[in-house]
């Protein structure tokens, strides 16, 4: 729940900046980021707040898994629509790729899920690492400090996926979150 509030607070700061500089692409990218992040946090909080016997548990688990795709695609949106927009086709190709994965992943997640899907985890990791195909244009487009933050985000996504894949280890799901 704290992540929802913090994310919304910082998101409003980013949106305020976008409106001040009158950059429609930045506003759209940050809006997608906020929708993905808040959607993911709300889905996860709702799912984990329910008792295991709740009739809503399975539906919310599907929403929780689908929302991870939105979070990843949303995280890429400002990068692709702002930073990589002037770097040839890289921004649009990466934007199309991650949102196509998010739509496909959402459809897949809304079907009956196994308790733990390796294909789903690999898809999350693949989406998270997809920026590597445009790493050189990214280095050209943004400051090194921005690249460091993007790398840190990728490391967090991959680390989360590793912890998630250790589902048989005690407390691994708690560490994942």
Language-model regions: role of each:
Residues 1-176:
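Multi-pass alpha-helical transmembrane bundles in non-GPCR membrane proteins
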């Amino acid at each position: 729940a704290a992540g929802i509030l913090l994310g919304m607070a910082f998101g409003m700061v980013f949106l305020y900046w976008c409106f001040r500089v009158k950059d429609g692409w930045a506003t759209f990218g940050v809006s997608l980021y906020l929708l993905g992040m808040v959607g993911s946090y709300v889905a996860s909080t709702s799912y984990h707040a329910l008792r295991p016997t709740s009739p809503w548990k399975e539906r919310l688990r599907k929403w929780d898994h689908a929302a991870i795709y939105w979070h990843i695609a949303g995280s890429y949106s400002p990068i692709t629509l702002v930073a990589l927009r002037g770097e040839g086709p890289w921004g649009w190709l990466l934007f199309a790729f991650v949102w196509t994965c998010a739509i496909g992943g959402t459809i897949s997640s809304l079907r009956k899920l196994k308790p733990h899907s390796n294909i789903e985890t690999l898809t999350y990791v693949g989406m998270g690492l997809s920026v590597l195909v445009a790493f050189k244009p990214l280095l050209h487009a943004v400051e090194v400090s921005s690249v460091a933050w993007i790398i840190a985000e990728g490391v967090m996504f991959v680390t989360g996926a590793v912890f998630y894949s250790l589902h048989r280890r005690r407390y691994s799901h708690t560490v994942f979150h």
